[in-house]
Amino acid sequence: MKIGSGEKLLFIGDSITDCGRARPEGEGSFGALGTGYVAYVVGLLQAVYPELGIRVVNKGISGNTVRDLKARWEEDVIAQKPDWVSIMIGINDVWRQYDLPFMKEKHVYLDEYEATLRSLVLETKPLVKGIILMTPFYIEGNEQDPMRRTMDQYGRVVKQIAEETNSLFVDTQAAFNEVLKTLYPAALAWDRVHPSVAGHMILARAFLREIGFEWVRSR
């Protein structure tokens, strides 16, 4: 288990991370962590590793791009003084290019995405024990689908930055691809973006695997 006793884990991202979390701080009980993968991760950490007392904060904001993360990074990440930061961003960076094709000011193209994400990781790396980079995803099994193809490019950037900075890497697209061998995309997300309960569990499982969570741990 890579996250240690009493350490603080902060999640940041878009609506997939947000999932109705409390404002201003997504921390605590009674739905404060939202209803998505963050809540599932916390539930399993508390159930299986209660002695670690890992503190979790959700700072996801629906609709965000990496550009938005940069604007709020100091307040929502650095000032929180986390031990670990998990970043999953990029879906809206890509999606706006397809659902709002003529509003180019909302598009975050690959070069800006890469430069901004790398800058945030490099700025934060010396201040924390570890960074976990999760790829954006598109719940579509056809790799030739235009938006899926673009999303894969952004995912490759995340992998490259993770390798460059020795960050943990969670390939969420690969996790979905495995389940898509059996299930139709609509079973996991009506719009191929916002996951169902099963979709969020896929994300949680992929995340937990990367941090060394032991599913068969006996206590």
UniProtKB/Swiss-Prot annotation:
UniProt KW Calcium keyword: no
Temperature dependence: Optimum temperature is 50-60 degrees Celsius. Is stable at 60 degrees Celsius and loses most of its activity at 70 degrees Celsius.
Catalysed reactions, semicolon-separated: Deacetylation of xylans and xylo-oligosaccharides
Catalytic residues of the enzyme: 15 (nucleophile), 191 (charge relay system), 194 (charge relay system)
Domain of life: Bacteria
SS bond partners: none
Main location: cytoplasm
Class of the enzyme per the UniProt entry, highest EC level: hydrolase
Record's keyword annotation contains Cytoplasm: yes
Keyword line: Carbohydrate metabolism, Cytoplasm, Hydrolase, Polysaccharide degradation, Serine esterase
GO term, biological process aspect, one: xylan catabolic process
Known outcome of mutating residue 194 to A: Loss of catalytic activity
Effect on the protein of changing residue 191 to A: Loss of catalytic activity
Site (Transition state stabilizer) location in chain: 63, 92
Localization per Swiss-Prot or TrEMBL: Cytoplasm
Subunit note: Homooctamer, presenting a unique donut-shaped quaternary structure built of two staggered tetrameric rings. The eight active sites are organized in four closely situated pairs, which face the relatively wide internal cavity.
Protein's recorded name: Acetylxylan esterase
Organism: Geobacillus stearothermophilus
